[in-house]
């Protein structure tokens, strides 16, 4: 059970910078193929006129992740344990998550591994296949340790590479402030004739909606942020203690002073999650500017990994090979960061789901073994079945995406509202509950999300 320790005094002022970190892992994970490929392609087709889509998509998901982390700070348990407390039949919400996320985790890593292999092979003299194995084995080893600080160090380094690589290109091809600022005004530009001739649909929403949906990741990314908050030891969470529900007896014993400390930690979560939204927005906009400044003038709208590869080639021809190399390096870092996040996050998520839904599993294995069993399974299922044998279970991929976008994410926002405003207040004494109850702003943001 957690927490069974005293609540640390939260840092204030500039000292808060010393404990920021979950946001780095969160941002590095969710900046993946959607940002590298979709944002660049949309920039090629629409220019910078739809930057508002990036901001909207990331902001709505940010609100879900930040609000879920607020619950974790105040209780010490992750988002999946919160879902187990939903009113109704026992663990019904967790069963939904277990089925849907098991499908996604079993096959999704393989597609990122494929894209990563293509990127790495453009930087090093290795084949696409070998490149995919290299980056995925690296991500597997980072995740295997199971400790937050190691993941944080690796992700921080990858974020720095992303910033350097993407901004180098974006600054050189920057469209000017007037055109740039127009991109923040909601508008739907028409598909240009040259793009229609290349097979792009005449319905702009077919290009825009995937970008909107992938902004800041999917359902799992927001759950994982609560794990990174636990890893950092914010508030009531015990550092790197996973796989345990909140200690209800201890929560009932919280004093007024401890509740005020938790409010301080909640503010740190607001600051930390804001770092994630700023990083994600700036880097994704950087990819869009690169597409608008390099591919659009050449009237090119490639798809898949070819978007970044062709952009790098064209940039190298015009402005030198250093920028083209850095752009590919930034794209590779983004995909590797996503792999690390997925292989560190999904095993935690599924281990929690199985622990709650099948208690015998938790009695038989300690948390680290549970985590590593799922990690090994997802590594093998993706790399052998999906990646090496080139099997793409299209129906499962589409089903996973459909469940995530149309079912899980709206339910996630609803469940967090219930968790914050109905479940959490019952865990404390009335005077403590009154202090920790979130204001109406969080609820409004979740309803919009």
Where in the sequence are the language-model features?
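Hydrophobic transmembrane alpha-helices that form the core helical bundles
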Residues: 92-124, 335-355
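Hydrophobic alpha-helical segments and their helix-loop junctions in multi-pass secondary transporters
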Residues: 160-200, 208, 218-227, 411-428
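Flexible loop linkers connecting adjacent transmembrane helices
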Residues: 2-5, 38-41, 66-90, 118-120, ...
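Loop-to-transmembrane helix boundary motifs in multi-pass membrane proteins
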Residues: 128-134, 322, 354-389, 442-446
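Transmembrane-helix boundary/entry motifs in multi-pass membrane transporters
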Residues: 10-12, 47, 74-103, 123-128, ...
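Extracellular loop-to-transmembrane helix junctions
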Residues: 14, 41-66, 83-84, 89-93, ...
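C-terminal membrane-solvent junction of multi-pass transporters and transport-like membrane proteins
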Residues: 157, 352, 362-374, 398-449
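Juxtamembrane transmembrane-helix boundary signature
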Residues: 26, 53-86, 97-103, 108, ...
